Amino acid sequence: DTHGLPIERAVEKELSKKKIRKESLPKTEFRKLCREYANRYVNIQKEEFIRLGVLGDWENPYLTMSPEYEATEIRELGKFFEKGLAYRSKKPVYWCIYDKTAEGQAEVEYYEKEDPSIYVKFPLKKEIEGKKAYAVIWTTTPWTLPANLGIMVKEDADYSLVEVEGEVWIVAKELLENFFKNIGKTYTRVLKDVKGRDLVGLEYEHPFVDRDELKGYLSEETLKNMWRIYPSEFVSLDTGTGLVHMAPGHGQEDYTVGKRYNLEPYAPLDDSGRFVEPAPEFIRGVRVFDANKLIIALLKEKGYLVHEARIRHSYPHCWRCKNPVIFRATPQWFIGMDIEYEGKTLSGESLEEIEKVKWIPEYGKNRIKSMVENRPDWCISRQRFWGVPITVFYCENCGEVIKDKEVFERIASLVEKHPGGTDVWFEKSPEEILPEGYKCPKCGGTSFRKEEDILDVWFDSGCSHASVIRPLGFEKADLYLEGSDQHRGWFQASLLESVGSYGEAPYRSVLTHGFIVDEQGRKMSKSLV
């Protein structure tokens, strides 16, 4: 594997010693430096593997950055477009605010993190029994509150309307005693109990966001539907209050419910995680985690903060830079797990193929099966430089995505013949890459721009069956051998890519091995710093 962010970061580090910023170089120049760096370490690792006694065809290794490999990868990608499985959409994905790129499920690791744990009361528009009424929510991500568009409840759950210091608070009946114990308060009386469905449709005011400031930024549909209580199957009564703050731009479940009720995935952040317009002025330019204390202070000042504490919990971190990631809605390319093609879905067909493979040890089957069953659509785009580009064009006139099979084949042929492989995509103009006189199939336009995102490196490695095994005359590999972390990595990426392209698993059997660890049980195959 010769592409990816670790190499970009290493090259950036070398450039910084010379006081050179990556942004000051043309993409082609930066990619050239990445290629040189990768080649240098391919040779070093090759020598080390030989010294260790590892057997391999060392004179003919396959490299994911070779023109032949990259050309095959582009053809494989073209098949997903041809079947209608690849699509572009704005929805929440893991986002590293330090590396400024989307990340996939296989690129996050969970570590303990300390965060605020706050209860906030949202004022309802209507009074209850002549008293000001509030929907009380719990969150560990105060920085997502500026993007709040709704509150979710469990339809068939019981909710208590309780009187507290002359106000009416709404909390799930099942969580009532625990909630008041947590906040160190008591309630005067229960006015009545209602079902969650009875709360649906109630409107509320945002504690610190002005509706008028969102006009011109959010759609009319969103402005009309936001700041109401909505039913959701994702609400649990394990912790919190049974009322869940919904930010469709910052959570997968929030996005699913928001889409159902025409609430757009709103996320007023830039790539480095700083708030931008139309976020409230007091947090503009502030990074998400730094904004927590400012938001909490304002809630306290306005009287909407019910209780504040700290919590240690398992939180996703970037596997490369080890910093916490966020969920952020951005336009990305996805491969759909449940899109129907030829009467099948990628998810369904992959699960069928898992049953045909021999898994050693046997627990590997259930492990990968549960991961495929529960995984979201595969986010395949990355906002970086060193990798295989997503080779589609956009019509400048109508915005149509150009994804013709013939165009993919033409690009793959150009890549195959170029010594720098996919560097040709970055060196040539759309006019030089597209067939002469090419016109947009939708509007007849003749002006195009190239997609700038690159492919997830897991798509790179997942293509090895097509780039290496099949050219040797084999339909599939007898054995894939790797560590248990690859059930969500290489084993899974290879399975999805092969099933999407050929309708079958790329391997007959999969063997999972363990790890050499240090005295604390940490894998020594990774940096221990």
UniProtKB/Swiss-Prot annotation:
It is found in: Cytoplasm. A motif ('KMSKS' region) lies at residues 523-527. It comes from the Bacteria. GO terms for molecular function: aminoacyl-tRNA deacylase activity; ATP binding; isoleucine-tRNA ligase activity. L-isoleucyl-5'-AMP binds at E482. InterPro entries: aa-tRNA-synth_Ia (IPR002300), Ile-tRNA-ligase (IPR002301), Ile-tRNA_ligase (IPR050081), Rossmann-like_a/b/a_fold (IPR014729), Val/Leu/Ile-tRNA-synth_edit (IPR009008). Its main location: cytoplasm. ATP binds at K526. Its EC number is 6.1.1.5. Gene3D superfamilies: HUPs, Ile-tRNA synthetase CP2 domain-like, Valyl/Leucyl/Isoleucyl-tRNA synthetase, editing domain. It holds the Pfam family tRNA-synt_1. It catalyses: tRNA(Ile) + L-isoleucine + ATP = L-isoleucyl-tRNA(Ile) + AMP + diphosphate. The keyword Endoplasmic reticulum does not apply. Keywords: Aminoacyl-tRNA synthetase, ATP-binding, Cytoplasm, Ligase, Nucleotide-binding, Protein biosynthesis. One of its GO terms (biological process) is isoleucyl-tRNA aminoacylation. One of its GO terms (cellular component) is cytosol. Catalyzes the attachment of isoleucine to tRNA(Ile). As IleRS can inadvertently accommodate and process structurally similar amino acids such as valine, to avoid such errors it has two additional distinct tRNA(Ile)-dependent editing activities. One activity is designated as 'pretransfer' editing and involves the hydrolysis of activated Val-AMP. The other activity is designated 'posttransfer' editing and involves deacylation of mischarged Val-tRNA(Ile). Belongs to the class-I aminoacyl-tRNA synthetase family. IleS type 1 subfamily. PANTHER family: ISOLEUCINE--TRNA LIGASE, MITOCHONDRIAL, SOLEUCYL-TRNA SYNTHETASE. Monomer. IleRS has two distinct active sites: one for aminoacylation and one for editing. The misactivated valine is translocated from the active site to the editing site, which sterically excludes the correctly activated isoleucine. The single editing site contains two valyl binding pockets, one specific for each substrate (Val-AMP or Val-tRNA(Ile)). This is Isoleucine--tRNA ligase. It comes from Aquifex pyrophilus. The gene is ileS.
